[in-house]
């Protein structure tokens, strides 16, 4: 199911190849941990699967990759003209995005005793 969905994404973005999983890793963010803004070079698409997400343990934040926003500021901000866009992490949420898209993970500020946010990140060529 996952690779069928990824194949659809590849095709829709003009790639005539099967997705190839190149690497993956686990992220364990304890209270006050966060991930600085970064991208994933040498990949076409990246993804994250949230496994364990305590309340207020941080969201993934994507930054608009172009500078148009700085020159043509809209009167109303919405999901089509954002400078940054965040998704609230929740268990079993699987997010696929272009690897060039800069993103970060906000600070884990949970008050839950079991405070670790756990996710699995993937890169596909």
Segments (PLM) and residue ranges:
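A short coil-to-beta-strand element that immediately follows conserved catalytic motifs
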Residues: 14-24
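Catalytic core of non-heme Fe(II) oxygenases with the double-stranded beta-helix
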Residues: 23-96, 106, 116, 121
